[in-house]
Structure formats: structure tokens, C-alpha cells
């Protein structure tokens, strides 16, 4: 049954990822805002959810964490987009993207952790 839950939540996460990409994607843009957006949102939600999750069953935590949020965020796309920016000699955008992804992700994770912690009290 666990695989079924992960598959269902994975479908939802992948669909949300696609919809977010459609919402934020601009073909003329040099900077990949859609990937940055989903990764920052996903990082925040995973941290918040992980800390708040004890009220849910182990199966639900795994299904939502692995299925929904795992399929919503994407590290491989970060790598491809960064290499693409470097190959087209958009070095500043590549550096900004990696920096925002790392530091923005850490900030979103910390914020999610703190808000999740506050909600448990």
C-alpha cells in the first residue's frame, strides 16, 4: 500500500511542478525562475512538514515527503540550467542562480523548521 501512496502523491507533486513551471516559465528569460521557485517552496514545505509531521502516520510522512515533495522539487534541472547558462556565457546569472538556490533553500528550510516548531507548541 505504501507504494500506492507514494505514487499518488508523486503524481500530485509532478502535476504541481508542471503547473508551476507553466506559470513562471518565460522563454525569453535567461534566469530559470520556475525551477528556483519550486525548489524554494519545496524546501520550505519539506522542512516545515518534517517537523510538523509527527501527528501523521509514518506511511503518510513518507508518501508526502517522498512522493509529493520529492516529485515537486528537482535538483537535476538546477544542474542542467546552470550548465546551460555557463555554456551561453551568462556567468553572473549562473552564479546568482546557484547562490539563491543554496542560500535561499537554507533560509526556506530554516523558516519551515521554525514555523513547524512553533506550531507544535
Where are these regions (language model features)?
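Membrane-interface helix-loop junctions in multi-pass transporters/channels
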Residues: 1-121
Amino acid at each position: 500500500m505504501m507504494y500506492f501512496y507514494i505514487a499518488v502523491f508523486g503524481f500530485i507533486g509532478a502535476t504541481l511542478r508542471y503547473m508551476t513551471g507553466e506559470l513562471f516559465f518565460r522563454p525569453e528569460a535567461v534566469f530559470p525562475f520556475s525551477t528556483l521557485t519550486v525548489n524554494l517552496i519545496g524546501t520550505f514545505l519539506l522542512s516545515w512538514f518534517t517537523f510538523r509531521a509527527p501527528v501523521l502516520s509514518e506511511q503518510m510522512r513518507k508518501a508526502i515527503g517522498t512522493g509529493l515533495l520529492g516529485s515537486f522539487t528537482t535538483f537535476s534541472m538546477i544542474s542542467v540550467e546552470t550548465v546551460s547558462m555557463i555554456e551561453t556565457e551568462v556567468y553572473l546569472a549562473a552564479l546568482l542562480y546557484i547562490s539563491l538556490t543554496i542560500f535561499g533553500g537554507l533560509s526556506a528550510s530554516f523558516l519551515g523548521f521554525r514555523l513547524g516548531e512553533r506550531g507544535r507548541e
